């Protein structure tokens, strides 16, 4: 039997529930949960309906035929056919959860849908809501009380919506379609008699119909949501940050866009108030990060070959940190910036698109980033999560493309595919950092069971589409003439 590739984990997140430690992940069009201790797969969503051994007995119903007789038709068979229909999305690019791991928020790709799940005690997902946004979400954040979702989209807007929607439909006063009323002709075919005027009337009626249909299409979502702020460029990342003050906590929304801007806005209900900007990048910004243990600092990166460290409350650049050698001509795309605290060290981890190295820095007291020995993985780094109590990193890697490339596929799949690797921090005597493999039993179990398969014989066109699902940020780069890379 020929081997096939496996969808890599696009997102991974460790959560600690009262009942168990879980690892949540997305790969292709599916969401997964695993035991972080054993690696056992607990659940997937949408559920795999290939096995019928747990299905209830078929129900029969009588259906009349054209000849006047009747035949029995299986309701289960009809439901099975519906369940076999492929999902309306091909990937789940954004996954986050509440701090206690009870609720998971996932964004499914093509349908622009924000889905909220409740994680059950057995690790299964119960979907509570699905809300289709006006534009495709590019980043999701939760407010400090974890009752509100903030959604940044590719149109440049940030909306807020409740984590758990109320059962009551929001009372939204309908807007009078004044334009349609004014544009509708007052004449009818009873008052117009000449052929020329009749043709003009038909054209006016057709135009009025199109305007009415366009007005209906432009109506916004029916669920509760509020527009908080907007950029003139598509948003690439967003953070919600809470800072303590003498009287109460001050909240902020930090947004980054394709046009090299980082904006600092006040939190709701004053999100329209702009505190300042952090300006200094010369290419698009793809990721911003505020360490939980050092919220006064902001680390940003994107299409430049360096990171920037900011005092973001003042809009002041503190440090510029190179990511590649000056002699390197390769274009850089920062895939992810993660902050974690392992032991007494505050670490900043950085992944670049198409790189099998995870760059590691320690965040010093003055905000500077001290380079450490990078971690070398078996494939391109896709996502990182940490188990801070165990000084451990879990890293998802791309086992489909050749390490170091975003478009060239490996000659053949491996068995099993390496989807996840784990390392434990080892601190040297003189402050140097080292890493040793760990959790090999758990990662081995996860890798062994795999995800959905990708045929090794996939055609080039389909391969290109799958590449774009993982490595599309490079298209944010502008050409020298000010256009976009297509």
Which stretches of residues belong to each language-model region?
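Conserved strand-to-loop turn within each blade of WD40 beta-propeller repeats
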Residues: 27, 107-110, 152-155, 163, ...
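Short coil/turn segments that connect the beta-strands within blades of beta-propeller domains
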Residues: 19-21, 100-103, 145-147, 243, ...
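Short C-terminal beta-strands that terminate individual repeats in beta-propeller domains
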Residues: 44-46, 83-86, 129-132, 171-173, ...
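Terminal intrinsically disordered, low-complexity extensions flanking WD-repeat/beta-propeller proteins
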Residues: 3-14, 30, 48-78, 165-221, ...
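Beta-propeller domains
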Residues: 21-74, 107-124, 266
């Amino acid at each position: 039997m020929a081997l096939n590739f496996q969808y890599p984990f696009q997102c991974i997140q460790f959560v600690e529930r009262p009942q168990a430690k879980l690892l949540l992940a997305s790969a292709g069009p599916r969401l997964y949960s695993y035991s972080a201790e054993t690696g056992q797969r607990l659940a997937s969503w949408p559920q795999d309906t290939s096995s019928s051994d747990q299905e209830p007995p078929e129900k029969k119903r009588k259906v009349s035929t054209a000849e006047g007789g009747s035949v029995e038709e299986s309701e289960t068979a009809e439901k099975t056919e519906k369940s076999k229909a492929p999902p309306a999305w091909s990937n789940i690019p954004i996954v986050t959860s509440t701090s206690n791991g009870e609720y998971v928020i996932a964004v499914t790709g093509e349908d622009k849908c924000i889905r909220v799940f409740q994680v059950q005690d057995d690790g299964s997902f119960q979907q509570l809501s699905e809300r289709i946004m006006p534009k495709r979400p590019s980043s999701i954040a939760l407010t400090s009380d974890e009752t509100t979702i903030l959604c940044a989209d590719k149109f440049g807007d940030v909306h807020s919506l409740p984590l758990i929607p109320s059962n009551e439909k929001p009372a939204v006063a309908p807007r009078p379609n004044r334009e349609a009323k004014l544009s509708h002709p007052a004449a009818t075919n009873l008052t117009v008699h000449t052929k020329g005027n009749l043709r003009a009337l038909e054209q006016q009626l057709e135009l009025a119909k199109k305007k009415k249909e366009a007005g209906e299409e432009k109506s916004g979502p029916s669920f509760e949501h509020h527009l908080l702020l907007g950029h003139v460029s598509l948003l690439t990342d967003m953070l919600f940050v809470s800072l303590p003050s003498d009287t109460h906590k001050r909240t902020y929304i930090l947004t980054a866009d394709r046009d090299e801007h980082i904006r600092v806005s006040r939190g709701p209900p004053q999100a329209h108030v702009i505190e300042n900007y952090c300006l200094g990048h010369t290419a698009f910004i793809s990721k911003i990060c505020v360490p939980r243990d050092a919220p006064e600092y902001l680390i940003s990166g994107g299409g430049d070959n360096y990171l920037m460290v900011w005092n973001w409350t003042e809009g002041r650049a503190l440090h510029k940190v190179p990511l590649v050698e000056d002699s390197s001509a390769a274009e850089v795309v920062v895939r992810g910036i993660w902050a974690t605290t392992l032991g007494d060290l505050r670490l900043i981890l950085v992944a670049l698109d198409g790189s099998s190295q995870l760059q590691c820095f320690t965040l010093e007291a003055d905000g500077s980033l001290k380079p450490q020995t990078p971690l070398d993985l078996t494939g391109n780094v896709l996502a990182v999560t940490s188990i801070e109590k165990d000084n451990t990193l879990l890293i998802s890697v791309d086992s489909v493309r050749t390490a170091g490339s975003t478009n060239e596929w490996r000659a053949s799949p491996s068995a099993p595919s390496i989807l996840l690797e784990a390392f434990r921090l080892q601190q040297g005597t003189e402050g140097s950092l080292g890493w040793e493999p760990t959790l090999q039993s758990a990662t081995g179990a996860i890798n062994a069971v795999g995800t959905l398969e990708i045929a090794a014989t996939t055609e080039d066109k389909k391969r290109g589409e799958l590449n774009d699902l993982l490595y599309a940020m490079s298209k944010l780069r502008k050409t020298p003439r000010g256009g976009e890379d297509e």
